[in-house]
């Protein structure tokens, strides 16, 4: 290692150590709080273990340039050694200490994530648009022992890290350019990866406070290999990545899958309809042939198309290019409105592949790759995934629930008398998460007594496919691919000096899936406009959680227990809104 780099690294490490006032304690050793069935293979090593075999193949293209698999591996190895040096970890194993990371949508995220894993840590991805208070909560709740930050995020995270007494390690320029000089030392210690914690992703829950979903390396392997098989990933694929990197869709489906098989990922810093269309239609190599997004992005791409591709010959060209070059287009993270699916097919010739998943289970259901897809359905179970549709057993004699249908990749068996009966979806398999971080009671409550994860989603099996009917709980709003906790938004809005009561509801929306709407009562003599509320809320809420609509009412109806029936509230306030709950629905 050249001397200039050594000096720079030591200065950065010294800064990181100096910022640490309190040493975060590590979680005591304990086994998993539930056991998933064994995977088909014990080969649960992380994706970076596969990288050396791909060598000089092109792994990533971003605003910084082109990066090979060898580049990613050696840069990650170098950073992992810095992490271990900072944590005084002589044997190179952090033993599941948490490593928070805030990076842009570029090579820095991959290197930071791989480095966290190489050093034996659990990666905790953060999001730059989250308010500082929420970033502080994630770092503190996960008890991260170090925070990695891209240079553009150091200013945001520095005061947070100092307040919490957690060392902040800015990513060096070598993360973005160059390779290590001593590849003969480029080996990661042998470890038993299978049950080792890999990643904590924070997701909203019905309690309102975000919960950390801890997945193991084997959980991630199960999701990735299932998708690789189902969607026929190969090293020749080139995917365009435009999603944030703090949830499963962006991290696993769009990043780890291509890197698992030696394919190429083209990353944009953020979504731009113009740039996406330019990439689709470009003749430059490598050419995009896979795309995945949330329904909101497809709506925005169609808006751009309507404004800029007005000539018939241009529209014919767009459709021809998309049909010829692109093999797979996927929609997920929120329900796909049928008009969006139909219009997109008319523009590109592609019937969007709909699938179903969530942070706790990865991906569970998917439409077929080549066979006909039923619009609105989410297909059948992925490899290794078992599902059940159930309802409560009123007798509670032999089982706490009644099984309507039970399925796997091979087939689904429906219980006689329960044909096309709705129920809650249960999931079991090696992709199901290990635990809610530091929340044993909530982890236990999330599973049935016989080990199935309760998704909280109402589904039905008909026409050979599974159909999602909606959340069992109305307090999780899916807007633009994000999951928004209505209870958390309510809790924060009640801090506004003019608001006395609030109910946050999800109203069906063509573009966003659901729009976050705040129903509010005010202090006597006070006034509040939607613009004023948005300006105030931006300081405490993520952009996608800021209410897009404000309704002022004299009183919010509550029952004797003080609870709001939000389905009734949506029906009352939006009786003609398409997709609003029907009378009597539960």
UniProtKB/Swiss-Prot annotation:
Gene Ontology BP annotations: fatty acid biosynthetic process
Catalytic activity entry: tetracosanoate + ATP + CoA = tetracosanoyl-CoA + AMP + diphosphate; malonate + ATP + CoA = malonyl-CoA + AMP + diphosphate
Superkingdom as given in the UniProt entry: Eukaryota
Sorted UniProt keywords: ATP-binding, Fatty acid metabolism, Ligase, Lipid metabolism, Mitochondrion, Nucleotide-binding, Transit peptide
A single GO molecular function term of this UniProt record: malonyl-CoA synthetase activity
GO cellular component: mitochondrion
Transit peptide region: 1-89
PROSITE patterns (UniProt xref): AMP_BINDING
Location of the protein in the cell: Mitochondrion
Residues that bind ATP: 203-211, 457, 471, 563
Record CDD domains: MCS (cd05941)
PANTHER family reported for this sequence: ACYL-COA SYNTHETASE (PTHR43201), ACYL-COA SYNTHETASE FAMILY MEMBER 3 (PTHR43201:SF8)
Family membership: Belongs to the ATP-dependent AMP-binding enzyme family.
Biological role stated in the UniProt entry: Catalyzes the initial reaction in intramitochondrial fatty acid synthesis, by activating malonate and methylmalonate, but not acetate, into their respective CoA thioester. May have some preference toward very-long-chain substrates.
Protein name (Swiss-Prot/TrEMBL): Malonate--CoA ligase ACSF3, mitochondrial
